[in-house]
Amino acid sequence: KLDQPAPSTQETSFIEKMKKTGRNIVVFYGSQTGTGEEFANRLSKDAHRYGMGSMAADPEEYDMSELSRLAEIGNSLAIFCMATYGEGDPTDNAQDFYDWLQETDGQLSGVNYPVFALGDKTYEHYNAMGAYVDKRLEELGAKRVFDLGMGDDDGNLEEDFVTWREQFWPAMCEHFGVEASGEDSSVRQYELKEHNDINMNKVYTGELGRLKSFETQKPPFDAKNPFLAPVTVNRKLNKAGELHKMHLEVDITGSKIRYESGDHVAVYPTNNTVIVNRLGQILGVDLDSVISLNNLDEESNKKHPFPCPTTYRTALTHYLDIIHPPRTNVLYELAQYATDLKDQENTDSMASSAPEGKALYQSFVLEDNRNILAILEDLPSLRPPIDHLCELMPRLQARYYSIASSSKVHPNSIHICAVLVEYXTKGVATTWLKYIRKSQFRLPFKASNPVIMVGPGTGIAPFMGFIQERGWLKESGKEVGETVLYCGCRHKEEDYLYQEELEQAHKKGALTKLNVAFSREQDQKVYVQHLLRKNKVDLWRQIHEDYAHIYICGDARNMARDVQTAFYEIAEELGGMTRTQATDYIKKLMTKGRYSQDVWS
């Protein structure tokens, strides 16, 4: 990065860009998995439908202190689509913006704004980032022109967004004195260019950044430049059960990739070739045609929806998410291509905010988990041009896994515990594109501090790395505190993950105590929280007297809450506290970094 020239003020000024291109609306997004960016693009597209000039913008690419100049543009509006990440934190691309908001005392009078927040109710800090931006902008003198929207990914995020958006635009039309008429027209963002005579060395084959980066792999490896890592071990962990829990080891020799126990590894999946081929067949196209989709807006920072030039086959295999159910905006744009009136009405209805349309989308698309291929197969007259479909589908996102190894013991490989919903070898690639994401999940600086790890099911993954590292420290002659694990599964003989490794670690003393809850082995279900209560005296000593660090990994919806409640109860009973005092006690442990969670819903 050192030899890259610093971007000029012109490039980092969204105000100059808006003035130059005649836009009055800017939609900023904080996005970790692509949804916030997708919603921002949809709002920007909406504005064009109403005849207003708009641009979606990544706050990381611009100087956000320029918000104070927004009033220089007549009828201006800044929309914020802000996702919350982790424990109430901003997304990576919104971190600098968040820091600026906290530190600035600049005046933002004359700035009109609304905020749509993206979050998940199962997490304690639900929509913390969106709520903070909404409140802080007002404190700095900006004017909220529409209520804060709250999107809940644990419920129906798409419906929350559509409902907010349907009320937002009529209010904005009134605010700007604009006629609300353009809603029915489809706006194309990209135009198709077919390359009949092109040097194939200039065609992308799945690379995310630099062309030919797979042939000449150069560090540093990150989201734009992932490492092509061979999978050296791929074995099934559970003996029975519906899900297939796999232990994978990927070779990172020569990559200079460094990782710590508790980090996440991001893996880019590829789509199933059967689905890709069937899409090509249904839409009647040669998937190996070389194409580019070029942005019709020449001033946009985003020249293409994915790396171009490429083939339809590469786009559908490596770049586009064709597996998840499509969002309503995709159906809205595709409805016009249905030649059968009934198919068109149904597709239109599912894209609307009418109660019956929402119910149809919920049952037909979400509950039945229909991807775009299934929808096209079920609506035989719906045959959109493939380039429009490629424009509309969201980008395929990396999947994050907790690393199940310690780099002290395994410096040249990364271990992963992954669940395959459908067990078929085609679901596991022989090479994986990957990079590392740092996490807050860290072993205590002082090895003499006890650690209490709670991780049922695949939540055990990061603790395999922790146990390996504590064992390594012990063998190196360090004083290591108690290492205590609470894990769980349904049946000992079916889905006890890493049984041999755990029993071996316990035998060698790397693991001081191994507590396993088998939930279905007896009449009364037993979960990890029951074992915590059972061992309350030991736990309270470890936490209150020996300064233990607590780590929770796994399901956010039930397990993490139930475990937290168990800790409250232990603090009440053995610490002589009220529930309020016990809650404050655990919150203080969180603030000090002694109670960490890596949870998902």
UniProtKB/Swiss-Prot annotation:
Pfam families: FAD_binding_1, Flavodoxin_1, NAD_binding_1. FMN binds at residues 31-36, 83-86, 118-127, 153. Its cofactor is FAD; FMN. Residues 25-169 form the Flavodoxin-like domain. One of its GO terms (biological process) is response to hormone. Binds 1 FAD per monomer. It is found in: Endoplasmic reticulum membrane. NADP(+) binds at residues 458, 519-520, 525-529, 562. It comes from Salmo trutta. This is NADPH--cytochrome P450 reductase.
